[in-house]
Regions:
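Polybasic/polar functional segments that serve as interface/processing modules
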Residues: 1-147
Length: 147
């Protein structure tokens, strides 16, 4: 039975943003999210949606999300702090370099102050027969625990 992982999840904190203009602009963020998911080859189900986070300057900014057939992409911007938090999760492979290139196009230079690329769903079966075999084994094991 051939197993793999379900997909990759990229989580970033981008700091020292050179140009913060787009970080507080609904239209710019909507366009950016559309361009980002197009570049990494994903299929939009809903969005992009952009919401404003109010409050003191260190907590105010925008959140943008797009729901994908492959999962999701989300960002949270903090213009006053010159920071962006990024999360891209997909069952379809994507290139991290493409994600970073889109951010450079949006804001110019930045520093990656936090970076995590995780393989999610280890031992995820890639075909139906493998999935049935995997899950029937789990059901058998669970049945014996409850008997």
């Amino acid at each position: 039975m051939e197993n793999d992982h379900y997909g990759d999840e990229l989580t970033l904190r981008l700091s020292g943003i050179a140009d913060i203009t787009a970080l507080d602009d609904d239209l710019a963020l909507t366009t950016f999210m559309r361009d980002l998911v197009t570049r990494i080859g994903m299929t939009v189900i809903a969005g992009p949606m952009v919401a404003t986070e109010g409050g003191p300057p260190e907590k105010s900014g925008k959140s943008a999300v797009v729901i994908l057939a492959e999962s999701h992409a989300a960002i949270h911007t903090y213009p006053h702090l010159r920071e962006i938090f990024v999360n891209v999760f997909s069952c379809k492979p994507f290139r991290e370099a493409d994600v970073l290139a889109e951010f450079r196009r949006l804001v110019g230079d930045f520093r990656i102050s936090e970076h995590l690329l995780r393989r999610r769903g280890e031992e995820w079966p890639r075909d139906l027969a493998a999935a049935e075999q995997l899950w029937s084994g789990h059901r058998t094991a669970l049945s014996s625990v409850h008997d």
